[in-house]
């Protein structure tokens, strides 16, 4: 190819692009269309494809059931009679007029408060002790965490045998001359027993979370505090608690939500008794829907439970601005 032909080709390419030379990475010449499948669009499509299974699962198992629950709450559904009648807001009016609801909410509140306090306090105490790197700490960590992976129903049944009037706990008390109470038949002891069973079931999870947070606290801060003459207790409240406050927030939200969803322990140990002293909201919902066959009212109670959980979660999340410490 001659030099004359090369110059002519270059001139033709300039005229085709309006007299401007296209440079790699530079602005696109006027009149040239941007390709649709750019690298950015391909990355976006890849991301959407990856989250599609999760979105489908959420739609089928979360969003659709919520819509159906709202729909059922507007109807009176009697499975035995085969009727499904629209009643509008009557179930919500029945919720407002339910004389049993205050006692149910009281029992739910007592259980939630007791569980959150004992669970978080014991989990933090165990985490602090295990963080001392004492001999055998790995064994104790495994022992405390093992109930988390045990079947909930099996765990509760075993505790039911231990808490009987002639069970293992009262047998131990008899050996030291103490007459143990009937744990599951007294109003106060029944609620306390259910709380203790749930605390020992899940304390290991919060303990592991606290332990991970404690191991992330820089040792230099404690060394500097010791040089300044700060006591161990002052170091704990001024250094440890602020730096693990995000984990405290996380564990408190998890524990509060879990406390409002308790069912198996009540169903196995007390069946809501004695009386209604341990009838929490989820168990009351179960009674209305599956024992008394008031499915519409049961759906209304589930909406009330959802509203309570959502309100408490939002409240905890908003309160984080006052006491949760972020290094950034």
Q: Over which residues does each language-model region extend?
A:
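A structural signal for multi-pass alpha-helical bundles of membrane permease subunits
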Residues: 43-328
């Amino acid at each position: 190819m001659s030099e004359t032909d090369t110059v002519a080709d270059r001139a033709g390419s300039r005229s085709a692009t309006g007299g401007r030379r296209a440079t790699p990475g530079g602005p696109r010449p006027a009149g040239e269309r941007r390709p649709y499948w750019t690298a950015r669009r391909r990355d976006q499509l890849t991301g959407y494809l990856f989250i599609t299974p999760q979105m489908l699962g959420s739609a089928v198992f979360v969003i659709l059931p919520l819509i159906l629950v709202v729909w059922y709450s507007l109807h009176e559904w009697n499975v035995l009679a085969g009727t499904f009648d629209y009643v509008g807001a009557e179930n919500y009016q029945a919720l407002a007029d339910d004389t049993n609801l205050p006692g149910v909410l009281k029992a739910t509140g007592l259980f939630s408060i007791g569980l959150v306090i004992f669970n978080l306090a014991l989990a933090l105490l165990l985490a602090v002790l295990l963080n001392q790197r004492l001999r055998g700490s790995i064994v104790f960590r495994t022992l405390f965490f093992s109930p988390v992976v045990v079947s909930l129903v099996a765990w509760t049944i075993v505790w039911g045998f231990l808490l009987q009037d002639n069970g293992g706990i009262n047998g131990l008390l008899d050996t030291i001359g103490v007459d143990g109470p009937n744990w599951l038949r007294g109003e106060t002891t029944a609620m306390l027993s259910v709380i203790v069973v749930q605390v020992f079931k899940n304390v290991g999870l919060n303990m592991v979370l606290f332990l991970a947070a404690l191991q992330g606290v820089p040792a230099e801060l404690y060394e500097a505090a010791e040089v300044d003459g700060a006591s161990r207790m002052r170091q704990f409240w001024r250094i440890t608690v602020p730096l693990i406050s995000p984990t405290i927030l996380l564990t408190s939200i998890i524990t509060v939500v879990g406390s409002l969803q308790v069912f198996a322990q009540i169903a196995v140990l007390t069946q809501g008794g004695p009386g209604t002293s341990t009838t929490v909201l989820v168990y009351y919902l179960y009674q209305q829907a599956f024992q008394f066959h008031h499915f519409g009212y049961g759906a209304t109670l589930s909406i009330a439970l959802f509203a309570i959980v959502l309100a408490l979660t939002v409240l905890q999340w908003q309160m984080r601005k006052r006491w949760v410490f972020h290094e950034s």
